Structure formats: structure tokens, C-alpha cells
A protein has these predicted regions:
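Acidic, His- and aromatic-enriched active-site or binding-groove loops in soluble protein domains
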Residues: 130-153, 158-159, 195, 218-286
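Short, solvent-exposed turn/loop segments enriched in Gly/Ser/Thr/Pro and often Arg
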Residues: 113-118, 164, 200-210, 230, ...
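N-terminal secretory signal peptides that target proteins for export/translocation
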Residues: 1-15
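Sec/Tat signal peptide C-region and signal peptidase I cleavage site
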Residues: 30-34
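Bacterial N-terminal signal peptides
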Residues: 16-29
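CE4/NodB-like, metal-dependent polysaccharide N-deacetylase domain
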Residues: 178-206, 293-295, 326-342
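Active-site and substrate-binding clefts of carbohydrate-active enzymes
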Residues: 36-94, 117, 243-278, 282-309, ...
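N-terminal catalytic cores of secreted or lumenal carbohydrate-active enzymes
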Residues: 35-175
Length: 490
């Protein structure tokens, strides 16, 4: 029998309101440990290296934004990218402005993933005083200020979570490349944010996740990662797949090891897809585990589901509490839901003045007024630790945002199969730009790893900046190889 799906509609508003009112009454009778729905944000900031060839000015490294703009090297309009009024503020002060309006909410905050390539680009513009000083030499100071603000539990209100330095599609890259991406990001963050304490969290580019990443994440000291809620949902035994709604492959039955949930909250979003998530199960943190098939050794981390449907709606227009109200009656106060709005922080409406200066504070205060709890992921996990036996399976895949992919477990937006001249799949004889790119990267990775085995491991600060004295050929090779894995070129 198909699982019941709840669609938001005007006709259900009265029922939802009644259910919500009942929930509030019930919550009032619960002991003090009972908790409401929590909310938080992840703002993702990224721009690539637009001209990853060797620098004309400096010879050894790739070009960063100031040189690329000055020499007009890229086919992209890099000047306009960085001269956008909103991006000038996104990369300097909008997050601080938004969080500065939430100081009366004791635990309210956000996470930001600021890719290393973007740090290098903005630093190049700030140091050069580009375009009349659009970016300050200390452009990072407002971020540092906000990272110094703390919740009631003493945790950062703005948590700079780790992200792959060059925004790779992590499940598709070699494990060694994946770890070097994380290590490069860890190398550039302290000098940028002025704090020796690295975040415990990880945001995967395009939210592309696979449990195969878990051993590398754990080895790099990462305790939790953000994942798409839909890939916990699709791994449930009774996921209500519908090709016209999902717009991607059906789940593999071998992936559907999560218990049947019986109820899925459905949202049809303007991206052209319907997300269906079991609540509360699909909107609260769990653990995910990878078992090495060769050794049987299990490694686990906490996975924090991002609310894909709600994130899309929250990022593209004024957003109230209606979608929280619709699911509030299903919250488990002992294991409360964490509704995480995770999306780009520098594109579309979600990167603009109204979003940061109006919507964040309006929503957060409206949510608090209704009894919901704005928080940060670190604060939530401290207040509501995930049990060691609370383990879910997370299906491979990314967020629903990528056009033509919609969370495909094959990552087809970056991994389109080989086709012939008629567009039919032809693996032995066909062509696909992405697949040929991966072939080149695989060969290059093999050469760099072989060189590393001969010459020794790199110093990551010199991989990030190979103009430093003592930089080796292996470090220069890693510098350029990592840039070649940028998702925007795939």
C-alpha cells in the first residue's frame, strides 16, 4: 500500500492550525526537557578560480580574481560577478548584519561554508584595492566579529564549517584528493577567520554526499556533515516514489534499509520537483555508518539533514512559519526536529539585501514567538546528543537544486554517461565531456600520487600558496590538481 503523503493546501490550513494548537497544549504539559522544533541556517559562499592556468604575473600559482579581471582572461564576466552590490556585502558583512539582529534570541545563529577558492579571490581584490576599494583589505573582519558572538551554551553564533577548498563533487573524487581538499581548507581558515578552533562540521559542495566519504571525514576530525533530507527519505522502505514528482532515478531497493515511516510531508517547489520527507524522522540528526568491506571496521559520524524543499522556498522569497506549523504536531519533544535552511548565500534572492536584512530576523523572531527555537547545529547537538545506536542509511546523491539532476543517486549533473551522436547511451564508443574530464583527472591524480610516494607528503600551506619559499614540485602539482576538480568545470 502506498504511503500517505501530506500536501500543503489552502483546504488543509484549518486542520494544520488545529493540529498545531493541540501540539502547543500538549507541549505545555510535558516536562522541562521537552523541546520544540529547532531552526538554523547554512549559507554557502563560493566562487571558483576562473583561470586555473599558471599566473602570468607570478608564474607558479593559478590566477586569482584580481589578475583574471585585469588581464580579461576568463570567458566569464568575472568583473560583474565580484562587483555585484549584493555579493560585495555577502562576502564581507551581510551575515554579520543578519545575526546582529538576533542577539535577543539566546541560541540563534547560522553556519557558513566559505570555500578556500573564494577566500583567495576576495583576498586578491581586497589587497589590490580593486575598483575603488569595493573589498576592504580586512574584508574578513565582520565575519570574525560574528564568529566571536556566542550562544547561551558558549558556542559560535556563526560557525565556519569546513567545505572542500575547490568545491569538488566529493563522492566522485579519489579519497586522497578529497582529504587534500579538506586539508587545504583547514590550512587557509585560521589565517582568514582569526581563530585556531576549526569547526566540527562539514558542508559537501552541491550537498553531494555518500557514506563512502565517512572514513575520510572522520580521519580529518569532522564530527558531523550536512546531508539532503531526501536521501534519508528515499532510503526508507516505504518511500512513495513517483517519476513525475521525483524527476530522477527510482531508489535502489538495496538502499531502502531505513524503517517504513508511514507518512511523508510533500512539497512541490518551483524548481520542478516534489520533495517527500518523513517527519519527524527525516528532519532530525542521526548517525550514518560506513563499514569497510575488506576489514569490517565501521566508522560513523552524525548526519544533519537539510530541509531541501523548505530551503528552496526560504531562499527565494519572504518566508514565514507556515511550513513549520504544518509539521509541528509531528515533532517528538524528546528528539526534536532541526529544520535546517541550507542554500547558497550569494546567489538569487537568498544572497540579497532583503534576505539578510529583513527575512532572517523576521522569520527567526516569528518562529521564536510561536515557540520554535532558533539555534546553531553545534548548540543543538550539545543540547540533544545523537545516540550511538541511532543509525540511518543515507542514499548517495546531492540536493534537489541541480537542474536535470534533482538529487540523482548517480550525480548525473556532473557524471553524465557516454552517448553517441544520436544521444543514445554508448559506453564503449560514446562521448561525454564530464566523463572525459574525469578520465583526465584520474590519470593526473595517479601521477601526483606516484610523485608523492617518491618525494614525500606535501605541506598543505604550500599547496595553498606555492609562492612560499621551499615549495616542492609535489606541492605545486597538488595546487593545480585540486583546482582542476572544481565542480563548475564538470
Amino acid at each position: 500500500m502506498r504511503s500517505p503523503i501530506h500536501h500543503v493546501s489552502p483546504g488543509s490550513a484549518a486542520a494544520s492550525a488545529a493540529a498545531f494548537a493541540f501540539t502547543l497544549v500538549a507541549l505545555a504539559a510535558l516536562p522541562a526537557a521537552a523541546a520544540p522544533i529547532h531552526t538554523s541556517y547554512l549559507w554557502h559562499m563560493h566562487q571558483p578560480i576562473y583561470w586555473p592556468d599558471r599566473s602570468t604575473w607570478y608564474g607558479v600559482p593559478y590566477e586569482t580574481a584580481y589578475e583574471t579581471i585585469t588581464l580579461d582572461h576568463s570567458q566569464s564576466d568575472v568583473f560583474t560577478v565580484f562587483n555585484s552590490d549584493d555579493r560585495v556585502h555577502d562576502y564581507q558583512d551581510y551575515p554579520k548584519t543578519a545575526l546582529g539582529m538576533l542577539g535577543d534570541l539566546p541560541d540563534a545563529g547560522a553556519q557558513v561554508s566559505f570555500a578556500g577558492s573564494l577566500i583567495q579571490n576576495v583576498t586578491s581584490l581586497g589587497n589590490a584595492g580593486w575598483n575603488g576599494g569595493r573589498y576592504a583589505a580586512n574584508w574578513y573582519q565582520p565575519y570574525r566579529d560574528a564568529m566571536g558572538w556566542t550562544t547561551s551554551g558558549g558556542r559560535r553564533r556563526l560557525d565556519p564549517v569546513i567545505v572542500g577548498f575547490h568545491h569538488p563533487i566529493n563522492p566522485l573524487v579519489d579519497d586522497a584528493v578529497f582529504r587534500r581538499m579538506i586539508q587545504a581548507q583547514k590550512a587557509i581558515m585560521p589565517g582568514t577567520w582569526g581563530s585556531p578552533t576549526l569547526s566540527n562540521g562539514f558542508f559537501p559542495a552541491e550537498m553531494c554526499f555518500s557514506e563512502r566519504m565517512i572514513p575520510a571525514l572522520a580521519a580529518e576530525g569532522i564530527q558531523w556533515a550536512i546531508v539532503p533530507d531526501i536521501h534519508i527519505a528515499r532510503a526508507c522502505a516505504d518511500y512513495p516514489y513517483n517519476a513525475n514528482q521525483d524527476n530522477c532515478d527510482p531508489p535502489n531497493p538495496a538502499d531502502q534499509s531505513n524503517p517504513a515511516q508511514g507518512y511523508f510531508y510533500a512539497q512541490s517547489i518551483s524548481r520542478g520537483v516534489t520533495t517527500k520527507v518523513p517527519v519527524p524522522y527525516g528532519l532530525r540528526p542521526h548517525r550514518a555508518r560506513y563499514v569497510d568491506p575488506g576489514t569490517g571496521v565501521a566508522t560513523s559520524i552524525v548526519v544533519v539533514p537539510a530541509a531541501n524543499g523548505m530551503s528552496w522556498n526560504e531562499g527565494y522569497g519572504s518566508y514565514g512559519t507556515g511550513e513549520l506549523d504544518a509539521i509541528a504536531s509531528r515533532n517528538d519533544p524528546a528528539k526534536p526536529m532541526l529544520v535546517l535552511f541550507a542554500h547558497d548565500g550569494d546567489n538569487a534572492w537568498q544572497g540579497g539585501y532583503s534576505y539578510y536584512n529583513e527575512n532572517v530576523t523576521q522569520f527567526s523572531h516569528a518562529a521564536a514567538a510561536k515557540g520554535y527555537e532558533p539555534t546553531t547545529i553545534e548548540e543543538y547537538l550539545a543540547d540533544h546528543p545523537v545516540a550511538s545506536d541511532d543509525v540511518v542509511h543515507v542514499e548517495d546523491g546531492g540536493w534537489v537544486n541541480a537542474d536535470g539532476d534533482f538529487g540523482s543517486p548517480q550525480f548525473i549533473n556532473w557524471n553524465w554517461p557516454l552517448v553517441n551522436g544520436s544521444g543514445q547511451f554508448d559506453i564503449p564508443n560514446g562521448w561525454a565531456e564530464d566523463e572525459r574530464n574525469w578520465a583526465v583527472l584520474t590519470a593526473a591524480t595517479n601521477r601526483v600520487l606516484t610523485a608523492e610516494q617518491i618525494a614525500g607528503a606535501p605541506v598543505m600551506s604550500r599547496v595553498v600558496d606555492p609562492t612560499q619559499s621551499g615549495t616542492t614540485a609535489v606541492e605545486r602539482a597538488w595546487h593545480h590538481l585540486l583546482a582542476g576538480h572544481e565542480s563548475g568545470t564538470m
